[in-house]
Amino acid sequence: MEKLLLITPPFVQVNCPYPATAYLKGYLTRQGYQAEQYDLSIELINRLFSRDILLRIFDACTPEQMGKDPHLERMYGLRERYLSTIDTVMEFLRKGDNTLATLICNGEFLPQAGRFDAAGELDYFFGNLGTADCAKFLCTLYLQDLSDLIRGTVTEHFEIVRYGERISMSIPLFAKLEAELRQSRNPIEEEMVALLERQIEAVRPTLVGFTAPFPGNLLAILRCAQYLKERHPDIRIAMGGGYPSTELRTMTDKAIFRYIDYIILDDGE
């Protein structure tokens, strides 16, 4: 019997679960299929915004990179504060602990780089009763600063809620995407395929299905598919969702099928 693994790829909105693969898993299970669901998007975000990975990113920064951008140079000077606060910030965003919210709203706790410069007067916006919302806002600025660091030193394709969107919009031709796929995987993509490999080993699927709701998912899907073709050539790969059913359906270049076995349009035809 087929064993399916349904994956939400990097990156979708991180402040609420994206339900497509969970709904599809439930439907397939009721139909008697063996199916599992995995949110690779949130797992990779949790991995990237951790002390371990952040330390690696800072250690890999070069003087040339820092010298080109005062914003990044400012962040590098605050590296120890970022390393000492990142796990607390992520714990708060996952659990919403009010004690942590109060700590975060203390103006001395979070390191502040360029994104904070335009934050405005927080008391005016949140008052005394909006501590949790204020903390979420500050954490968002903090993570946006770190995203700028990743984009400036690791890969230009990174954003918290999308990956490689600009290059993925270059349809109907596949050449730009394939040129990117010929490049070595960057550190973010290495973390992504490491997480994928763990799930493949745990589930042992015969078919992996990716949902692609947005253009900012396509490059990550193709990187995962490329890895699966290299390491697990017997696994078949399918892709569906909002993006293939709309803009991507105009693609005429069949080279995409070197990576994806099936592209599912609309409701599955």
Where are these regions (language model features)?
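Conserved phosphoryl-transfer catalytic core
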Residues: 47-106
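A short, charged/proline- and glycine-enriched loop
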Residues: 1-4, 203-204
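Generic preference for hydrophobic/aromatic residues in regular secondary structure cores
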Residues: 86, 143-146
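Nucleotide-activated donor-dependent transferases that construct or modify glycoconjugates
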Residues: 3-13
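Glycine-rich beta-alpha loop elements in corrinoid/cobalamin-binding modules
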Residues: 11-14, 18-51, 90-120, 125-130, ...
